[in-house]
From Swiss-Prot:
GO terms for molecular function: proton-transporting ATP synthase activity, rotational mechanism. This is ATP synthase subunit a. The chain crosses the membrane at residues 43-63, 103-123, 149-169, 223-243, 245-265. It is found in: Cell inner membrane. F-type ATPases have 2 components, CF(1) - the catalytic core - and CF(0) - the membrane proton channel. CF(1) has five subunits: alpha(3), beta(3), gamma(1), delta(1), epsilon(1). CF(0) has three main subunits: a(1), b(2) and c(9-12). The alpha and beta chains form an alternating ring which encloses part of the gamma chain. CF(1) is attached to CF(0) by a central stalk formed by the gamma and epsilon chains, while a peripheral stalk is formed by the delta and b chains.
């Protein structure tokens, strides 16, 4: 790739589509992905943040509009779809969550729909929004799938982890939660260091696996679309991109469902009284 960022080879094309639109928090200037080194702690992927916020607001506005205009008569298509999603999530929470909190069902609904919407950005033509961003707004780079950004998925997983700690302390108390970490699986004071290591690893592995699983699947899916577009001539891309897009619909739905299910299960485990 040239210094100006001009795309000349398939390798440049693939690398260009893997660059984020980044903001340097120290200078509040956009980072040029073609002339700088690796991202630092002080860089913010504002494209991922922007699309995740926009999709979250879209979810809230649509569901609020449907709730405000819902009727007891024959529902429209949008109301029917929303009711099916709510019913599906509610049944999942009833089956998997055994606590008493009334927050879990709305949380599960938010997680499922939000992650699903972010995943669905992967079905857009790979060059559509980046082309608009570059030629209309002059952006040096743009990625549109928030869940293909590990900082987004781990941030969501961190939120779940905080809720796990909150419900564990709420249901068991500080002493009970501490005892759970230090006296399991070996109930003897001499094994407290071993128990703390084992339980600490088990506790930390939940948000890590939750975030990395979603990121890994969505990053791989996005990369396959980029490879198809970057390595094949335009007239033959549809032969692979269309079947992969159809199969990818299953993947993005399944990943949203898995993220929701694991969130419910982890919070159910945290809400159990011992």
């Amino acid at each position: 790739m040239s210094a100006s960022g001009e795309i000349s080879t398939p390798r440049d094309y693939i690398g260009h589509h893997l660059n984020h639109l980044q903001l340097d928090l120290r200078t509040f200037e956009l980072v040029n992905p073609h002339s700088t080194g690796p991202a630092t702690f002080w860089t913010l992927n504002i494209d991922s943040l922007f699309f995740s916020v926009v999709l979250g607001l879209a979810f809230l506005l649509v569901f609020r509009k449907v709730a405000a205009s819902a009727t007891s008569g024959v529902p429209g298509k949008l109301q029917t779809a929303v009711e099916l999603i709510i019913g599906f999530v509610d049944n999942s929470v009833r089956d998997m969550y055994h606590g008493k909190s009334k927050v879990i069902a709305p949380l599960a609904l938010t997680v499922f729909v939000w992650v699903l919407l972010m995943n669905m950005m992967d079905l857009l033509p790979i060059d559509l929004l980046p082309y608009i961003g570059e030629h209309v707004f002059g952006l040096p780079a743009l990625r549109v799938v928030p869940t293909a950004d590990v900082s987004i998925t781990l941030s969501m997983a961190l939120g779940v982890f905080i809720l796990i700690i909150f419900y564990s302390i709420k249901m068991k108390g500080v002493g009970g939660f501490t005892k759970e970490l230090t006296m399991q699986p070996f109930y003897h004071p001499i094994f407290i260091p071993v128990n703390l290591i084992l339980e600490g690893v088990s506790l930390l592995s939940k948000p890590l696996s939750l975030g990395l699983r979603l990121f890994g699947n969505m990053y791989a899916g996005e990369l396959i679309f980029i490879l198809i577009a970057g390595l094949l001539p335009w007239w033959s891309q549809w032969m692979l991109s269309v079947p992969w897009a159809i199969f990818h619909i299953l993947i993005i739905t399944l990943q949203a469902f898995i993220f929701m299910v694991l969130t419910i299960v982890y919070l159910s485990m945290a809400s159990e009284e011992h």
